[in-house]
Amino acid sequence: MDPRELAERLTERDLRILIHLAESGEATPEELAESLDVDLGPVMRSLYWLEERGLIESEEETHEVYELGDEGKEYAEEGLPELRIVEVLRKIGGEGRLEEVLDRAGVPRKLAGPVLGWLRRKGLAEIKREDGETSLVLLEEEPEDVDQSVLEALAAEGSASVEELARKLEMDEEEVEKALKRLSERGDVLRAREETVKKVRLTERGEEVAEHAPEVLERDWITELKPEHLREGTWKEKEFKPYDVKAPTSPTFPGKRHPLKEVINEIRRIFLEMGFVEVSGPLVESSFWNFDALFQPQDHAAREMQDTFYLKEPAEAELPDEEVVEKVRAVHEDGGDTGSRGWGYEWDEGVARKTVLRTHTTAVSVRKLYEVEGPPLKAFSIGRVYRRETVDYKHLPEFHQCEGIVLAKDVSFRDLLGILEEFYRRMGFEEVRFRPAYFPYTVLSVEPEVYFEEKGDWVELGGAGIFRPEVLQPLGFDPDVVCLAWGLGVERLAMLKLGIDDIRDLYMSDLKTLLELPTARARR
């Protein structure tokens, strides 16, 4: 596209920016916004678009910016202590007793030494000692103090660089730097920080387009079709400005659910579509349902205080009917009627009564199995679970799990693998594989893994298996009844779907991050 045609496609703001840069050579976005009398946001969008088209180039420069500290604000308003002393001396005839002058100038005794030093250093006054008396003698009645000028300039501007101060005060930069150095030696007078400034300038291509900018701005053409143009027919006599459909616009942030909530809703939708019913259970659970009913021994490491949250109040929970409790006791001690040898220890009902914050949603599944009369049953649950984890990029003490079960007489291990493969396929993962695993309450047991293309690796996403007879038979199910079961970490799945490497980012309240995160379905 030739320079003239490109100029015709630019907005009025773009053209004015090019003209300004052609005249000034370079400018900051803030300077352009002030010159064009528009907000900084639209200027930044224009600069981004112009740079994308190769019409301008940008460069970032880092320099020190100064602002006043608490003492500096006081001195800017009331004057530096040495200048206040000069004013007092001038009013009393050029000489006075030291204590009297300090008092009238409002200079604390603790600052007397440093202030006298500045008086001598700047040649404003000298100390005279005579007959045991110490006096101050004025040497300069109307000093032009650069330090005070810098303080007042910073008070007016808020903050400024050496270059900006020199320009405002019409001084050499070297003179301003010396003043800043002196002021920096005086406690909390100045505060310095680094600031990065972006400057833009025209490229060779931009200079060619800028030559046509004034002419294009002066053209009398229609930039926006209005009702009066149609009503009066004036559109027939005028030229329409070319419309660039690729021109940048303000970003739109419509309302949306929290990204983690999106993932949870997608999981729920998929299981409902697959014919499952959703069930739920209490967050505060008895150790019986959380551990014992799942054939997890009472001395298992997962039940220790460093892994599980035990409650002080209520400290104990009620157990189900005695028949179920006794059957669970039997499978733990000697296997009961299951053919298993159990764990070979004396089961303690008191330990089973202890209350915990549930450590997994499998407790919801086993409660549901206790409540139903028999197969068939296809159920899932999604809920919060709690573990004593050290918080890091992949662990939280509170997180979500999804649990599912299929209770039937005519299902097998292959059905379990098929259900999981279909679920992950609907979640957007085409490649799924299973690795052998061990869990106390399932046999056979596997860990599903999905291939994550962006990382080029396989990622484990949960655990699955067939509930052992030691879990099902105490609940009243016949030996020919099979229960497929699985559980997965929702946050880990969400991290993959959303492209997040740190699990803590899912719970950040930073609005910018939440606005920019894609929805879960956007990455399918």
Curated annotation (Swiss-Prot):
<keyword id="KW-0067">ATP-binding</keyword>
<dbReference type="InterPro" id="IPR006195">
    <property type="entry name" value="aa-tRNA-synth_II"/>
</dbReference>
<dbReference type="GO" id="GO:0004826">
    <property type="term" value="F:phenylalanine-tRNA ligase activity"/>
</dbReference>
<dbReference type="InterPro" id="IPR011991">
    <property type="entry name" value="ArsR-like_HTH"/>
</dbReference>
<protein>
    <recommendedName>
        <fullName>Phenylalanine--tRNA ligase alpha subunit</fullName>
        <ecNumber>6.1.1.20</ecNumber>
    </recommendedName>
</protein>
<dbReference type="InterPro" id="IPR022917">
    <property type="entry name" value="Phe_tRNA_ligase_alpha_bac/arc"/>
</dbReference>
<keyword id="KW-0030">Aminoacyl-tRNA synthetase</keyword>
<dbReference type="InterPro" id="IPR036390">
    <property type="entry name" value="WH_DNA-bd_sf"/>
</dbReference>
<feature type="binding site">
    <location>
        <position position="362"/>
    </location>
    <ligand>
        <name>L-phenylalanine</name>
    </ligand>
</feature>
<feature type="binding site">
    <location>
        <position position="467"/>
    </location>
    <ligand>
        <name>L-phenylalanine</name>
    </ligand>
</feature>
<dbReference type="GO" id="GO:0000049">
    <property type="term" value="F:tRNA binding"/>
</dbReference>
<dbReference type="GO" id="GO:0000287">
    <property type="term" value="F:magnesium ion binding"/>
</dbReference>
<dbReference type="GO" id="GO:0005737">
    <property type="term" value="C:cytoplasm"/>
</dbReference>
<keyword id="KW-0436">Ligase</keyword>
<dbReference type="InterPro" id="IPR045864">
    <property type="entry name" value="aa-tRNA-synth_II/BPL/LPL"/>
</dbReference>
<dbReference type="InterPro" id="IPR036388">
    <property type="entry name" value="WH-like_DNA-bd_sf"/>
</dbReference>
<dbReference type="Pfam" id="PF13412">
    <property type="entry name" value="HTH_24"/>
</dbReference>
<keyword id="KW-0479">Metal-binding</keyword>
<feature type="binding site">
    <location>
        <position position="441"/>
    </location>
    <ligand>
        <name>L-phenylalanine</name>
    </ligand>
</feature>
<keyword id="KW-0460">Magnesium</keyword>
<dbReference type="GO" id="GO:0005524">
    <property type="term" value="F:ATP binding"/>
</dbReference>
<dbReference type="GO" id="GO:0006432">
    <property type="term" value="P:phenylalanyl-tRNA aminoacylation"/>
</dbReference>
<keyword id="KW-0648">Protein biosynthesis</keyword>
<dbReference type="Pfam" id="PF01409">
    <property type="entry name" value="tRNA-synt_2d"/>
</dbReference>
<keyword id="KW-0547">Nucleotide-binding</keyword>
<comment type="subunit">
    <text>Tetramer of two alpha and two beta subunits.</text>
</comment>
<dbReference type="InterPro" id="IPR004529">
    <property type="entry name" value="Phe-tRNA-synth_IIc_asu"/>
</dbReference>
<dbReference type="InterPro" id="IPR002319">
    <property type="entry name" value="Phenylalanyl-tRNA_Synthase"/>
</dbReference>
<comment type="similarity">
    <text>Belongs to the class-II aminoacyl-tRNA synthetase family. Phe-tRNA synthetase alpha subunit type 2 subfamily.</text>
</comment>
<keyword id="KW-0963">Cytoplasm</keyword>
